[in-house]
UniProtKB/Swiss-Prot annotation:
Domain S4 RNA-binding: 356-413
Protein name: Tyrosine--tRNA ligase
Gene3D superfamilies assigned: HUPs, RNA-binding S4 domain, Tyrosyl-Transfer RNA Synthetase
UniProt organism field: Mycobacterium tuberculosis (strain ATCC 25618 / H37Rv)
Gene Ontology MF, one: ATP binding
Binding residues annotated for L-tyrosine, in chain numbering: Y36, Y171, Q175
Miscellaneous comment as given in the Swiss-Prot or TrEMBL entry: Was identified as a high-confidence drug target.
EC number: 6.1.1.1
Gene behind this protein: tyrS
Amino acid sequence: MSGMILDELSWRGLIAQSTDLDTLAAEAQRGPMTVYAGFDPTAPSLHAGHLVPLLTLRRFQRAGHRPIVLAGGATGMIGDPRDVGERSLNEADTVAEWTERIRGQLERFVDFDDSPMGAIVENNLEWTGSLSAIEFLRDIGKHFSVNVMLARDTIRRRLAGEGISYTEFSYLLLQANDYVELHRRHGCTLQIGGADQWGNIIAGVRLVRQKLGATVHALTVPLVTAADGTKFGKSTGGGSLWLDPQMTSPYAWYQYFVNTADADVIRYLRWFTFLSADELAELEQATAQRPQQRAAQRRLASELTVLVHGEAATAAVEHASRALFGRGELARLDEATLAAALRETTVAELKPGSPDGIVDLLVASGLSASKGAARRTIHEGGVSVNNIRVDNEEWVPQSSDFLHGRWLVLRRGKRSIAGVERIG
């Protein structure tokens, strides 16, 4: 059964590059493999872009293989070279704190138990932190050709521009050594990562062969992009879509995926969920025949919110999504969920002494361009407050109208939402 994992990855479109697939399939068929993926703590949280390699680890575990999640406590202090510009170096204490936070996130995606498939968490600072400069140059650097390293696309682009520091230039060597250490310690024979990591992973494959005489494998998954070319995983505010609920609320997370374009949603379902081929075919047919129902998008958002934030948070944000658009009770929403939902819209602050009539609130919240436009919308029956229609342009909110004593939900028409927050 364990060898079938490559067939699943293939039909899901999850193989971007690999070492010889026949050899890899034969090893997977012989019995459980140990597989790893690494994640550098360059921020306090992982983000949506990390999900594909993380979930691929989980697929391997479900197929009977043992996953290792590697937190880059050492490599995170350097940073993988980017196409443009040097990374800012973070303080060691900051990286250590982020490493622990990310370690906790990594542990949500694979199962830890005493079985042969029980996951392992490692931190590469354990073996890299004590590595002396002489050991690094003799035992690792000696195996790398500068000519080959200079031929890497990212390095060539950096050298053609502002250049690259020796620190970032050496990142590849440290990541390659991780593969050596994980093979020594755990018999790891497969590293997976994003397609942009191919050069680093292959360097590790070669270093294992040169230092240990062992054959190991590499497999990369596609980088996620939207069909229109926009970058995947950016929230409505332009920042990353973080897994930490304090950095990206469960509501914002859910809304990002429920708004996935029809052109992307089936591909995302293949990559981000464990739905079967038959279930995906049904959702693809529903999208083609009844796109307005957005069944595939709602399933994608639900699956991923449960995965990252749990069932209770998912139920809360699904109710919030319905309630904001008039299909549920706003009063049942807890304040944290309501506030997070409204902050994904425009929120007008209502301070003591500020104009608080409905016309002023519509303009302040951006739902109407002018007072005249606001009055017209009210007379046409297109304005509601807390899901109750307002047809009087002189309407002023009373204290009892504020949800949790603080919030109003304004809606113009069926889809345009804004919030009002009472301050002071």
